[in-house]
From Swiss-Prot:
One of its GO terms (cellular component) is nuclear envelope. Belongs to the RtcB family. InterPro entries: RtcB, RtcB-like_sf, RtcB_euk. There is a cross-link at residue 496 (Glycyl lysine isopeptide (Lys-Gly) (interchain with G-Cter in SUMO2)). It is found in: Nucleus; Cytoplasm. The active site is at residue 428. GO terms for molecular function: GTP binding; metal ion binding; RNA ligase (GTP) activity. GO terms for biological process: in utero embryonic development; placenta development; tRNA splicing, via endonucleolytic cleavage and ligation. This is RNA-splicing ligase RtcB homolog. The gene is RTCB.
C-alpha cells in the first residue's frame, strides 16, 4: 500500500532552518525518529526524489533517501535518531550520507554492512607543501604526468609497491604501522590519521581468500570511480588559527588530496558478510524493512566476524593511502629535484568516510558505548576530544571534504554541537544528484575534459569514458553541502581548496 506524496508530507516536519524531522510512522517499525540536514536547494532535491518515488519512478532500484533514513530508524538497537547529512543520496541499504549509532549493551542491537558500504574505509588524505601556486604553474603538466606515472590508476590497476601474501596479512593487521615499518610512511603521518591508521580489532583470518586475492595486486593503487589524487591550492582561509595549526598559512599554498579506499578487497569483505548475515537473520528472526539492510546482532559470530574483517579492510585502505602518499612524495621530489622533507610534504589529516566504530557518546545525559555506522559521512570530533591528535586539541578534528572533479574541496573542523546532535559526524563530499547511468547518458566525456582544461586544470585520466560519471554536473553543489553543515553548527569551515591538476582512475 503506497501513500500519496501529500500523505507522506504529514510525517515530515521542519524543525530548524537546516533540519527536518522524519516522524515515526513514515515507514513501519521505526524505533526512533529520523532527521536530515538541508538548505533550500538541497531540500528541493530531497523532496523531488520522494515525489518521483510516490509516482512510481524508483531511483535505479534504490528507495528514495528519506525512506532509507526511515528504514534505518527501524533497525534493532538504534539510539537517538537516524541521521541524514546534507550530501545524502540513495544507496545500498543505508543511503550514502546516513549515519546511525547502535547500543553495544543492547543484546538485540545490530551491525549492518550496508551502513558501512562496499568500499570500506573509503577516505581522504590531505598533504600540504611549502610550494606556492606560482612554483607549480610552470611545471603543472610535468607534475600531473609524474603523479600519473608514479601512482597506478584505473579499474584493474596493479600496485608498484612489492607485496607478497605474508606482507598482505601483516598490512591487514597493522595498517599504517606496516607502512611505517617498511619505510613507506613517516612517523608523524600516523599521528594525523583517524584511529592512528590502525584498527586494533582487525583479524586477517576473517578476510576470505577471494578478498585477499583481489587485494594483493591492488595495494597502492588509485581505483576508478570517484577516486582521485588532486593537486590543489588554498583558495580561501575561513579560520586562520585552525589553518595555521594545519600548516596552512597563505592563499595559493599548494596541497595534495588523495581519495581512495580498500579497492576489491573491501568490496569482497562486504559481499561475504552480506551472504553470512542473510542466514543469521533467518536464524535470529531479525526483521528489517528492506532486505538490503541485511544485518546481524553485534555480539553474534557473524557480527563479530564482519567487524574484524571490516577493520582489516580499513587497515588495508590506510596502507593504500600511505603507499600513494609515498608515491606522491616521490613524484614531487623528482619534479622539483629536492627531497619530500624539504617540500614539507606532511599529512594534514586522513579521514574515513565508510566505517563502523565503537565510540563513547552521551545520549540523554548518560555516557553510552555505541557502534557508530558512518556511511558517506565523516567523523568530526570537537576540540579537547581524547581521540584526536595533540596538534588539533584546540581546533577540533580536521574534516576533509572532497568536492567533485574540478570543483572546490574544503577542510572543516569538528564542534561540540556536532557531538551532541550527530554523534560527532558531518558530511563527506558533494553527494550524487544524478545516477552514474544517467550521467553517462546525459554527458559527453570530451565536453567534460574540455571544460576542465578551460578552467586551467591539468588532467590525467586512465579511463576517460568514466569521466562523465564524476562530472561536477552529476553531483550536488559541495559548497551548499558544506555551508549547510556550517550553518547547522555540526562542523565549521576552515579552508577552501581549488584544484589545478586531477589524476583519476
Amino acid at each position: 500500500m503506497s501513500r500519496s506524496y501529500n500523505d507522506e508530507l504529514q510525517f515530515l516536519e521542519k524543525i530548524s532552518k537546516n533540519c527536518w524531522r522524519i516522524k515515526k510512522g513514515f515507514v513501519p517499525n521505526m524505533q526512533v525518529e529520523g532527521v536530515f540536514y538541508v538548505n533550500d536547494s538541497l531540500e528541493k532535491l530531497m523532496f523531488e526524489e520522494l515525489r518521483n518515488a510516490c509516482r512510481g519512478g524508483g531511483v535505479g532500484g534504490f528507495l528514495p533517501a528519506m525512506k532509507q533514513i526511515g528504514n534505518v530508524a527501524a533497525l534493532p538497537g538504534i539510539v537517538h535518531r537516524s541521521i541524514g547529512l546534507p550530501d545524502v543520496h540513495s544507496g545500498y541499504g543505508f543511503a550514502i550520507g546516513n549515519m546511525a549509532a547502535f547500543d553495544m549493551n543492547d543484546p538485540e542491537a545490530v551491525v549492518s554492512p550496508g551502513g558501512v558500504g562496499f568500499d570500506i574505509n573509503c577516505g581522504v588524505r590531505l598533504l600540504r607543501t611549502n610550494l606556492d601556486e606560482s612554483d607549480v604553474q610552470p611545471v603543472k603538466e610535468q607534475l600531473a604526468q609524474a603523479m600519473f606515472d608514479h601512482i597506478p590508476v584505473g579499474v584493474g590497476s596493479k600496485g608498484v609497491i612489492p607485496m607478497n601474501a605474508k606482507d598482505l596479512e601483516e598490512a591487514l593487521e597493522m595498517g599504517v604501522d606496516w607502512s611505517l615499518r617498511e619505510g613507506y610512511a613517516w612517523a608523524e603521518d600516523k599521528e594525523h590519521c583517524e584511529e592512528y591508521g590502525r584498527m586494533l580489532q582487525a583479524d586477517p583470518n576473517k578476510v576470505s581468500a577471494r578478498a585477499k586475492k583481489r587485494g594483493l595486486p591492488q595495494l597502492g593503487t588509485l581505483g576508478a570511480g570517484n577516486h582521485y589524487a588532486e593537486i590543489q591550492v588554498v583558495d580561501e582561509i575561513f579560520n586562520e588559527y585552525a589553518a595555521k595549526k594545519m600548516g596552512i598559512d597563505h592563499k595559493g599554498q599548494v596541497c595534495v588530496m588523495i581519495h581512495s579506499g580498500s579497492r576489491g578487497l573491501g568490496h569482497q569483505v562486504a559481499t561475504d558478510a552480506l551472504v553470512a548475515m542473510e542466514k543469521a537473520m533467518k536464524r535470529d528472526k531479525i526483521i528489517v524493512n528492506d532486505r538490503q539492510l541485511a544485518c546481524a546482532r553485534i555480539a553474534s559470530p557473524e557480527g563479530q566476524d564482519y567487524l574484524k574483517g571490516m577493520a582489516a579492510a580499513g587497515n588495508y585502505a590506510w596502507v593504500n593511502r600511505s603507499s600513494m602518499t609515498f608515491l606522491t612524495r616521490q613524484a614531487f621530489a623528482k619534479v622539483f629535484n629536492t627531497t619530500p622533507d624539504d617540500l614539507d610534504l606532511h599529512v594534514i589529516y586522513d579521514v574515513s568516510h565508510n566505517i563502523a566504530k565503537v565510540e563513547q557518546h552521551v545520549v540523554d545525559g548518560k555516557e553510552r558505548t555505541l557502534l557508530v555506522h558512518r556511511k558517506g559521512s565523516t567523523r568530526a570530533f570537537p576540540p579537547h576530544h581524547p581521540l584526536i591528535a595533540v596538534d588539533y586539541q584546540l581546533t577540533g578534528q580536521p574534516v576533509l571534504i572532497g568536492g567533485t572533479m574540478g570543483t572546490c574541496s574544503y577542510v572543516l573542523t569538528g564542534t561540540e554541537q556536532g557531538m551532541t546532535e550527530t554523534f560527532g559526524t558531518t558530511c563527506h563530499g558533494a553527494g550524487r544528484a544524478l545516477s552514474r547511468a544517467k550521467s553517462r547518458r546525459n554527458l559527453d566525456f570530451q565536453d567534460v575534459l574540455d571544460k576542465l582544461a578551460d578552467m586551467g586544470i591539468a588532467i590525467r585520466v586512465a579511463s576517460p569514458k568514466l569521466v562523465m560519471e564524476e562530472a561536477p554536473e552529476s553531483y550536488k553543489n559541495v559548497t551548499d553541502v558544506v555551508n549547510t553543515c556550517h550553518d547547522a553548527g555540526i562542523s565549521k569551515k576552515a579552508i577552501k581548496l581549488r584544484p589545478i591538476a586531477v589524476i583519476k582512475g
